[in-house]
């Protein structure tokens, strides 16, 4: 997946990367379920770690809490992407690239900017 970002930034000159999550995410629900899902557990672990650091451990999650975890996960992914060698090299060479975190509401169709943009020098 990072090869796509590298190609977009270094070859195509993409200036904006959007990390977009969505409310009602099955991955978020799976991560907090306490169950193992085999190979995808590797992808769920960062969400589990985030949930543990942001919320008290629990078995029941309210919809607003799950929504907030969706938002927090997007913000964490923006930060993680900003730390990759690909983006660090792009910024180091003077490329103007911004990473934006957005969230999509499946119920209302609204796309919202989470305000967690990272750009060169941030």
Segments from the language model and where they lie:
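Divalent-metal-activated hydrolytic enzyme cores
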Residues: 1-15, 26-122
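Conserved functional hotspot residues or short segments at active or partner-binding sites
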Residues: 19
């Amino acid at each position: 997946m990072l090869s796509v970002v590298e190609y977009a930034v270094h070859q195509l000159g993409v200036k904006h990367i959007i990390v977009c999550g969505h409310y009602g995410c099955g991955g978020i629900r799976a991560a907090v379920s306490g169950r193992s899902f085999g190979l995808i557990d590797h992808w769920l672990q960062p969400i589990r770690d985030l949930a543990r650091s942001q919320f008290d451990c629990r078995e029941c999650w309210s919809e607003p809490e799950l929504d907030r975890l969706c938002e927090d996960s997007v913000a964490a992914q923006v930060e993680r992407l900003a730390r990759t060698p690909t983006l660090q090299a792009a910024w180091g060479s003077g490329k103007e690239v911004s990473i934006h975190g957005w969230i999509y509401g499946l119920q209302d169709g609204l796309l919202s900017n989470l305000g967690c943009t990272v750009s060169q020098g941030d």
